[in-house]
Structure formats: C-alpha cells, structure tokens
Design a protein with these regions (language model features):
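Short, surface-exposed beta-strand/strand-loop-strand elements in extracellular ectodomains
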Residues: 45-66
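Hydrophobic beta-strand core residues of beta-sandwich domains
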Residues: 26-28, 69-70, 85
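Noncatalytic modules at the cell exterior or secretory-pathway interfaces
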Residues: 83-97
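Exposed aromatic-hydrophobic patches
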Residues: 74-82
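Short loop/turn positions at the edges of beta-strands in beta-sheet-rich folds
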Residues: 42-46, 85-87
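C-terminal interaction-tip segments
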Residues: 1-33, 37, 43, 95-114
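Short proline/glycine- and polar residue-rich coil/turn motifs
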Residues: 67-75
Length: 114
C-alpha cells in the first residue's frame, strides 16, 4: 500500500546543461517507491537530448535514453516505466540544452514483500 504520492519536478532555470541532477531520492526511512509517470517538456527553439538514470551510490541500476533530439516549441515526451526504487535510490536526469522541464509522478512508502 502506498503512503505518499509525490510530484517531483525540475524547472528550466534549476538545472545545468549536461549535468546529472537528482529529480527524486528515496528517503532512507521508507521501504521503497515507484515512478509511474515521467514527462519532459522542451519550451525552447532548440532540440535537446534527454537522459534518465536510476542510481544507488555509484551503481547505475537503470538507464533510459530519451528520444534523440526532442524538438523545441513545447514538444513533450511522456513515458511510464514502473520502476521500483529502494531506500537511497536516486532518479537523475540530464539534458543537452536549456529550456527543459522535468516532471515525475511518484508513489513512495511502498510496502515491499520481504
């Protein structure tokens, strides 16, 4: 059973180009979380490449390369991945240009089977 529903986001002015930024990190006191909707919007005129990764420390657990050259002018990419996250896992995002908004809908506090 889920305890908390979250919407995590990073606005265009809140990230650095070609730098991994943490969109969401699972609290160590929770038993897990799940990403069930992810959206990226490109509001500028330039095309941009999007990357997403799930990491725990230095270990890459899951990697997603978004559509190559996501077009500008408000084009969005929506994706559902059903990724189960454990304590200390981080959902990180990276964009090759400015003007991108990242959003994720996350259920945290999942009761995972022992």
């Amino acid at each position: 059973m889920a305890e908390v529903f979250n919407r995590a986001y990073i606005e265009p002015e809140d990230y650095q180009i070609n730098t991994w930024m943490t969109l969401y990190k699972v609290n160590t006191q929770l038993t897990g979380a799940m990403v069930f909707d992810f959206s990226v919007s490109n509001m500028k005129d330039n095309n941009v490449t999007i990357e997403i990764q799930l990491v725990n420390g230095e270990n890459i657990l899951h990697y997603i390369l978004g559509p190559t050259e996501l077009q500008g002018q408000g084009i969005a990419w929506d994706s559902s991945h059903k990724i189960v996250m454990m304590p200390n896992d981080e959902l990180q995002v990276k964009a090759s240009a400015e003007g991108v908004s990242f959003y994720a809908s996350i259920v945290s506090g999942l009761k995972l089977p022992a």
